[in-house]
């Protein structure tokens, strides 16, 4: 029963952590399916139009050359329809195969072969590291690790590389690439009630003011801000006030609007919307897993100022992770376990806790192992006591 419960918990944890592994390729498949549907519908309508024109012409006894010309047009439209359909099917097939490959990979965790499970765990760790590196901007390192580990089809490199192009264009203070991304994902961004495109148009207006192209700014506003409403309308009113001030004004809020730091805000906004679009969290799975693991073993002993209670085998006690775990909650322990400072063994009925006269507690087996001439030396204070002075501790 306990084994089944543990397996169920592992399966649930896997579903939570591996959600992005399947969600991203599924969303790509869904996007390609919708695009294919639009393309085929458009090409089909073109075929229908030329066929209707051919039928209309045939009803009026046309000359042969006219019919041949119309037939050539029908063949051309049918060829275009066939080509678009083949391209769409191929793109959908690639996405479907990628989804299948990832599902098969996730199924490997339930293998009966320990060696296979260990290989799967190694791949999973590599996947977590690749995603974390991509989020941190180490794209070349992430791509090399994915290639060396053979997991290129198990990680979302393409999505992050696309995001990299957009972010780099915003760093260059260019909006075209990001606007193209918004256009490609227009319907889903609208459902998310994203304001990214509006923010980009606002920034374009600000840049025109900065360049003292005020008439261009007015035309830009008429074109892109006419449909603004609610909070957006208030923002439009605010930026329109910039028309009355020079580009080097020190008057707030126009000085803040002209601050180049707004481009960094746009990068953060794009990153946030991109993660929401693919239903990814703001933190990587590696970060979440690491924090959960640190929190599970974090105790008050890890932060004692004297440092004597720190365990060299405890990750939280190590310098590299101690600060990282500081804001995390302590481990939830319904039943406490006493661990011997000397051996690291659990103190229980087979290894009862023994207290020396100075108040420090160690396991009975450890005191036996360090006893010499019926005396023991406390590892912490270096005080010497008779072995018989150690008293058994009882926990109520």
From Swiss-Prot:
Domain LisH as annotated: residue spans: 121-153
Enzyme superclass (EC): transferase
Alphabetized GO MF terms: actin binding; ubiquitin protein ligase activity; zinc ion binding
Sorted UniProt keywords: Actin-binding, Cell cycle, Cell division, Cell membrane, Cytoplasm, Cytoskeleton, Erythrocyte maturation, Membrane, Metal-binding, Nucleus, Transferase, Ubl conjugation pathway, Zinc, Zinc-finger
Localization (cell): Nucleus matrix; Cell membrane; Cytoplasm, Cytoskeleton
GO annotation terms (biological process): cell division; erythrocyte maturation; proteasome-mediated ubiquitin-dependent protein catabolic process
Keyword Lipoprotein recorded: no
Short name of any one Pfam family annotated for the protein: CTLH
Chief localization: nucleus
CTLH domain boundaries: 159-216
SMART domains assigned to the protein according to its UniProt record, in alphabetical order: CRA, CTLH, LisH
InterPro entries: CRA_dom, CTLH/CRA, CTLH_C, Fyv10_fam, LisH, ZF_RING_GID
Record's GO cellular component terms: cytoplasm; cytoskeleton; GID complex; nuclear matrix; nucleoplasm; nucleus; plasma membrane
Site (Essential for ubiquitin ligase activity): 314
Reaction equations catalysed: S-ubiquitinyl-[E2 ubiquitin-conjugating enzyme]-L-cysteine + [acceptor protein]-L-lysine = [E2 ubiquitin-conjugating enzyme]-L-cysteine + N(6)-ubiquitinyl-[acceptor protein]-L-lysine
Keyword Cell cycle: yes
Transmembrane residue ranges: none
Record text about domains: The expected RING-type zinc finger domain is highly divergent and most of the expected Cys residues are not conserved. Still, the protein is required for CTLH complex E3 ubiquitin-protein transferase activity. In addition, the conserved Cys-314 in this highly divergent region is required for ubiquitination by the yeast GID complex, suggesting a direct role in catalyzing ubiquitination.
Assembly and binders: Identified in the CTLH complex that contains at least MAEA, RMND5A, GID8, WDR26, and RANBP9 and/or RANBP10 as the catalytic core. Interacts with F-actin.
Role this protein plays: Core component of the CTLH E3 ubiquitin-protein ligase complex that selectively accepts ubiquitin from UBE2H and mediates ubiquitination and subsequent proteasomal degradation of the transcription factor HBP1. MAEA and RMND5A are both required for catalytic activity of the CTLH E3 ubiquitin-protein ligase complex. MAEA is required for normal cell proliferation. The CTLH E3 ubiquitin-protein ligase complex is not required for the degradation of enzymes involved in gluconeogenesis, such as FBP1. Plays a role in erythroblast maturation and in the development of mature macrophages.
Protein name, as recorded: E3 ubiquitin-protein transferase MAEA
Organism: Danio rerio
The gene coding this protein: maea
């Amino acid at each position: 029963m306990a084994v089944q419960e543990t397996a169920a918990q592992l399966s649930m944890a896997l579903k939570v952590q591996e959600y992005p592994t399947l969600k991203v390729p599924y969303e790509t498949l869904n996007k390609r399916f919708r695009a294919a549907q639009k393309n085929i519908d458009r090409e089909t309508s073109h075929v229908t139009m030329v066929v209707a024109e051919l039928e209309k012409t045939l009803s009026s006894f046309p000359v042969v050359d006219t019919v041949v010309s119309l037939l050539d047009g029908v063949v051309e439209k049918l060829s275009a329809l066939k080509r678009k359909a083949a391209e769409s099917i191929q793109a959908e097939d690639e996405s479907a195969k990628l989804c299948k490959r990832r599902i098969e990979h996730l199924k490997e965790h339930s293998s009966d072969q320990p060696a296979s499970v260990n290989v799967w765990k190694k791949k999973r760790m590599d996947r977590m590291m690749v995603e974390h590196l991509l989020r941190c901007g180490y794209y070349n390192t992430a791509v090399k690790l994915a290639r060396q580990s053979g997991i290129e089809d198990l990680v979302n490199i393409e999505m992050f590389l696309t995001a990299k192009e957009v972010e780099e264009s915003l760093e260059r203070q260019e909006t075209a690439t990001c606007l193209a991304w918004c256009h490609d994902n227009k319907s889903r961004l609208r459902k998310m009630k994203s304001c990214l495109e509006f923010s980009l148009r606002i920034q374009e207006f600000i840049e025109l003011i900065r360049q003292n192209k005020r008439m261009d700014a007015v035309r830009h506003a008429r074109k892109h801000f006419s449909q603004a409403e609610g909070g957006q309308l208030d923002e439009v009113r605010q930026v329109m006030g910039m028309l009355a001030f020079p580009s080097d004004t020190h008057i707030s809020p126009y000085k803040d609007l002209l601050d180049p730091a707004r481009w960094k805000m746009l990068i953060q906004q794009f990153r946030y919307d991109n993660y929401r679009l693919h239903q990814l969290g703001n933190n990587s799975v590696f970060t979440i897993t690491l924090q959960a693991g640190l929190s599970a073993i974090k105790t008050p002993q890890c932060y004692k100022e004297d440092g004597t209670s720190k365990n060299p085998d405890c990750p939280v006690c190590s310098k590299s992770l101690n600060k990282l775990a500081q804001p995390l909650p302590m481990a939830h322990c319904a039943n406490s376990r006493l661990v011997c400072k000397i051996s690291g063994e659990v103190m229980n009925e087979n290894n009862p806790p023994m207290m020396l006269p100075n108040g420090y507690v160690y396991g009975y087996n450890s005191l036996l192992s360090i006893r010499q001439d019926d005396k023991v030396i406390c590892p912490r204070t270096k005080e010497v006591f008779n072995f018989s002075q150690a008293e058994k501790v009882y926990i109520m």
